[in-house]
């Protein structure tokens, strides 16, 4: 179960005028969790209200398929993963990653 002690991670991708991607790793503290009849919403200061099912499915993709990192999708951040994702984003900013479709 998710609580306000958990954090949300997000890898943002933007392009400059030369069409070169730049990445930023954002960590957001959970302000509150709203359990409703139809869905459970997670609220942070940085993001719009997030659906818990979407967060859990993205986090499960990270856990089950090692080596694949999804950008522009929020996920539940584990305590030991923050340094890893920051290192990946720093490496991507030095040398942009290739798409899996290349």
At which residue positions do the language-model features occur?
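Acidic, low-complexity, intrinsically disordered interaction modules
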Residues: 15, 20-80, 84
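Short acidic DE-rich linear segments
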Residues: 98-102
């Amino acid at each position: 179960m998710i609580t306000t002690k958990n954090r949300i991670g997000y890898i943002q991708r933007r392009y400059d005028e030369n069409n070169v991607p730049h990445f930023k790793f954002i960590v957001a503290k959970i302000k509150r969790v709203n359990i409703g009849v139809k869905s459970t919403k997670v609220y942070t200061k940085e993001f719009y209200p997030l659906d818990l099912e979407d967060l859990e499915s993205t986090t499960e993709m990270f856990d089950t398929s090692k080596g694949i990192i999804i950008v522009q999708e929020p996920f539940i951040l584990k305590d030991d993963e923050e340094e890893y994702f920051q290192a990946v984003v720093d490496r991507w900013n030095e040398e942009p990653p290739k798409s899996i479709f290349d």
